Amino acid sequence: MLDHTRAPELNLDLDLDVSNSPKGSMKGNNFKEQDLCPPLPMQGLGKGDKREEQALGPEPSEPRQPTEEEEALIEFHRSYRELFQFFCNNTTIHGAIRLVCSKHNRMKTAFWAVLWLCTFGMMYWQFALLFEEYFSYPVSLNINLNSDKLVFPAVTVCTLNPYRYTEIKEDLEELDRITEQTLFDLYKYNSSYTRQAGGRRRSTRDLRGALPHPLQRLRTPPPPNPARSARSASSSVRDNNPQVDRKDWKIGFQLCNQNKSDCFYQTYSSGVDAVREWYRFHYINILSRLPDTSPALEEEALGSFIFTCRFNQAPCNQANYSQFHHPMYGNCYTFNNKNNSNLWMSSMPGVNNGLSLTLRTEQNDFIPLLSTVTGARVMVHGQDEPAFMDDGGFNVRPGVETSISMRKEALDSLGGNYGDCTENGSDVPVKNLYPSKYTQQVCIHSCFQENMIKKCGCAYIFYPKPKGVEFCDYLKQSSWGYCYYKLQAAFSLDSLGCFSKCRKPCSVTNYKLSAGYSRWPSVKSQDWIFEMLSLQNNYTINNKRNGVAKLNIFFKELNYKTNSESPSVTMVSLLSNLGSQWSLWFGSSVLSVVEMAELIFDLLVITLIMLLHRFRSRYWSPGRGARGAREVASTPASSFPSRFCPHPTSPPPSLPQQGTTPPLALTAPPPAYATLGPSASPLDSAVPGSSACAPAMAL
């Protein structure tokens, strides 16, 4: 009778006769590691011994397969090999099946593996090119030619005669006298004032000394000597009466900072340019003394400058124009601006279907030292755009009929990632000081004015100013001229960042102008034309040919071009190109991409599980020695790793319980010890809980 209480100490290698082979036995291999699990009671013999089957009872049943309820919710493959084999057998990607079907031919397997990897590389290289093109945000320019009625643009015409205001008339006359005296001192030029004033005028030094920053003739210093590198910017040598040598002198005036620690000369090689800039500098100071509310102009209304005005063969009226004053270009009149109740529309092209003006261009000699051009200044612009006469205007010549033909062009650009433009200027870090919509020129002038106010403490008179800020005047800000010319030099070099801050608008409308000139009026017709103009306007034209000019502005054609940008590569086209490349190299669909994603996910999960098992086997496995024995004794059987084959606990088989059938006794002859070995016994399949040793990987 077997002693079941000693079973855990047995370490016998059994050799059971499980076959009818001539040798009658099968030997197992010796175990290299002692089994820590106690053996279960024997419930039967091996299937190979028929005699013992009949003696011991019926054959044990086959191991029960797990049902769906007992299977894990999510199962993964046991190894990478099994995963890749399953993928190659079931994927819809062309060529993958060849890796499995040709596994018995290593050369074919290697060939298809290399070909498959090269195909993947080529495809993803094409993918990289497609993504690079998409994220470069290219645009396509679409050109559309449209034909329709067109809104006539706004037209601004200026007299080119800066006007003398009543409030500053005496100051301007004093400036004229000082300028003429300066010309006499520097060039011995006798103007009408110097010839008529005679002894009534003050002495030269008294008259010029009353005005700061006098105009001087400066001798150009020699080239700088390295031994004298610490010369200041005001190193030009002043000489009131040097010998005139064009290679050795310049004309200019000195400007200094607040504490006179830094000075420089604003010089010009041309005396005409120097006199005009010097006069302009003092003229700006005088204009700054005007009140904020513009005074009434002494000049007569529109009829004193514009003899005739017609649009589409209909006469103009006072509601068709607005008036403002420009410091350099005099009185200006804007036709068809945004304040016009009914904007002019052009339904036909040609000179007879546009704006026709007859202008008076006689020079009234208001400020001859400031205005040296005769004629008129004209600019074509949008209704909601200010007229920057310095930037976009052109001059009309007296005695000439100037015909300006226009072509409208519209440009719609893409902003955001596709281009550096702004929709309405709200995202531009510059405050719009003009009562108009955003344009790039509006932003640039506003940016300069902001820097002028910030660094010089006053506003430049040519640009609008915010409330609470005064225009620059050297009687209040003595060093504003020094600050202004320094700032102007930095502005020209874009050191202020105005050109980079002020982005172009996304929607721009331009008018392409073409000019034609002809003599007007002709010799045969000038007598009656001048006579009619004089009678009509109650004004006698003294210098007939230089006293009038004709201006025609019209659309050359009603066809206008619209240039619009659109993305060259959209998300739809990108996906289409990616799908085309995928189909080209693998002949697959979107579901194949999902299969690839599933493969990558399975690889990551299997790797994570294997790392977790390695971590647990390294840090949580039972130790060796007495400490390990205690840990094993105190560890529940269910917590052992699968290699320890834990079995469910049951009462000792040596003590049968009442009401139950005692276990069968082992009546087989004892095994031959010469054939002892760790032969796998079929009894293990009938042992409850033996499925815990299965290597399946499940969650």
From Swiss-Prot:
How is this protein annotated for GO cellular component?
acrosomal vesicle; apical plasma membrane; ciliary membrane; cytoplasm; cytosol; external side of plasma membrane; extracellular exosome; membrane
Q: In which tissues is it expressed?
A: Expressed in kidney (at protein level). Expressed in lung (at protein level). Expressed in the epididymis (at protein level). In the caput and corpus regions of the epididymis, expressed uniformly on the luminal and basal surfaces of the ducts and in the sperm in the duct lumen. Also expressed in distal colon and, at low levels, in liver.
Q: Which regions are flagged for Low complexity bias?
A: 227-238, 656-667
Compartments where located: Apical cell membrane; Cell projection, Cilium; Cytoplasmic granule; Cytoplasm
Q: Which family does it belong to?
A: Belongs to the amiloride-sensitive sodium channel (TC 1.A.6) family. SCNN1A subfamily.
Which gene codes for it? Scnn1a
Q: Which residues cross the membrane?
A: 111-131, 590-610
Q: Which Gene3D superfamilies match?
A: Acid-sensing ion channels like domains, YojJ-like
Q: What does this protein do?
A: This is one of the three pore-forming subunits of the heterotrimeric epithelial sodium channel (ENaC), a critical regulator of sodium balance and fluid homeostasis. ENaC operates in epithelial tissues, where it mediates the electrodiffusion of sodium ions from extracellular fluid through the apical membrane of cells, with water following osmotically. It plays a key role in maintaining sodium homeostasis through electrogenic sodium reabsorption in the kidneys. Additionally, ENaC is essential for airway surface liquid homeostasis, which is crucial for proper mucus clearance.
- Quote the protein name from its UniProt record: Epithelial sodium channel subunit alpha
Instruction: Give the residue ranges for region: Gating release of inhibition by proteolysis (GRIP).
Output: 200-270
Which BP terms does GO give this entry?
A: cellular response to acidic pH; cellular response to aldosterone; cellular response to vasopressin; intracellular sodium ion homeostasis; multicellular organismal-level water homeostasis; regulation of blood pressure; sensory perception of salty taste; sensory perception of sour taste
Q: What happens when the gene is disrupted?
A: Scnn1a homozygous knockout mice develop respiratory distress and die within 40 hours of birth from failure to clear their lungs of liquid. No other obvious pathological change in organs is observed.
Per the record, ranges on the Extracellular side are 132-589
- Spans annotated as Disordered: 1-71, 211-244, 637-699
